């Protein structure tokens, strides 16, 4: 059975994800990209992974500079998510008007994020039309306990709290049978 790109994308769109902006600095130029393909990899050493399209300038900049930062967006930072995804019409410099901080690696850090992780490229793996870039976390900082920005089914969203204290285990009396 062959999986079409459309079916593959539709299935993956069902997975809710946090939203990050990955940034780097190379040859005096800031680069940034909205990324939802972000994961923790290891605690010792502290490693994370991002997946970036091989055709993008930011991919080349990360590989050439050997550094990147991951900025975890709060729900109030939808504009950053859209801006760095290239969804703001007429915007050529995604950093225009954004007062960034500078990480120890030189990567730009967005203000007031949930957290940021400053990374050195540990390893780059081929992954089809993307690279799986593993970074060693050199520095990190958490923000002020805000709620995360979420991306699900090609829509931006936020978390709605569920009262887990009233949840019944699957298969027990009172458990939901809805799909």
Identify the residue ranges that each predicted region occupies.
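Basic, polyanion-binding surface patches
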Residues: 1-179
